[in-house]
Amino acid sequence: MASSPCKLPIGSAGEIVAMVVYTSFAIGGSLGNIFIILVIYRTPRLKTVCGVLIANMAVADLMITSIVMPIMVFTLVQGFLKLCFYDTAIYIAFLIALFSGAASLLTLTALSVDRCFAVCRPMKHKAMATLTKVKVIIAKTWVKSLLLPIVELFYRDSVPAKYIQTLGVIGCYAIILVSGVLTIRNVRASSSRIAAMHNDQGRVRMTAELKQRNKQVAKTMAVVVTLFTLCWIPIAFVISVKIPDTQDRIFFWFATLGLANSSLNPWIYFYRQINYREALKMLLGCKKSLSNDRVIADPSNETLETK
């Protein structure tokens, strides 16, 4: 049965479920992203290159949870009231989602390269990766992210523009993949070196601790990248195959899955990273100060100490 032009084509039960889902993700995601930004801003030892990149990704995610998701809730309410002006609201949400998604992917790419550099060349990373440089990278990231909504607004049916978008996404994932492979190879090589240093207990212990941190770095990045991929690939596929009615159920729920990624990201960091959990406790007044035994000597890895 055809859907009313004044209602999203997901049925009354679907609208109720969607309202609950979007409201929950909007509240939980906004709180999580705000907490990430605040703990990095208020904790000096988290203000590293990695920390600033994570905060930038939280800003991009906050755009989704605090703007796009409330717009979707508003749209669902208008559907119940049988008013016919939600199309404009959805299009605005779509443009903001494109902008935020591009910023997230570019930031995730920069974060993957930074972590690979920190693991494979820690001394060079410490000397070369500065906050000034990363702020320039972040500024360029937001400028580049404007390309997607601009293309959607003015060159929607342009084939070259679509190819450029596709190549951009593939290029980012290629960089992330190469960075991940190099990181894993370095961690495995470290394991072999530890096994060969059985006569030097002091070096074995220090190297083993570094190797463990590096493994956790790889795991954390793998979780974040995998979640991003699983959430966004379905809707990207639906858009690429050009389903005739882009307002159908499949498009709506796959889009919801993609947007949900912005609500989940901050809680991944709090779950896996001890430093972030402790900083959050301080922020909420549950803990007076960070314990000294959690301080990590190597600034390149300090924001990725995990469970």
Language-model segments: what does each one mean?
Residues Y22-A26, M63-K82, A97, G101-L108, ...:
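Helix-to-loop junction signature of class
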Residues V59-A60, L182-I235:
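Intracellular effector-coupling site of seven-transmembrane GPCRs
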Residues G11-T23, V49-S112, A118, K162-T166:
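Extracellular TM2-ECL1-early TM3 structural module of rhodopsin-like
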Residues M1-F35, L76, E305-K307:
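Extracellular N-terminal segment of 7TM GPCRs
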Residues I175-V181, K219, L227-S240, I250-P299:
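Seventh transmembrane helix
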Residues I194-M206, L284-K307:
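Non-transmembrane, juxtamembrane loop and terminal tail segments
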Residues M63, F74-V77, S100-V113, F117-P160, ...:
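Fourth transmembrane helix
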Residues A26-G29, N56-V68, K133-P149, V169-Y173, ...:
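Alpha-helical transmembrane segments of multi-pass membrane proteins
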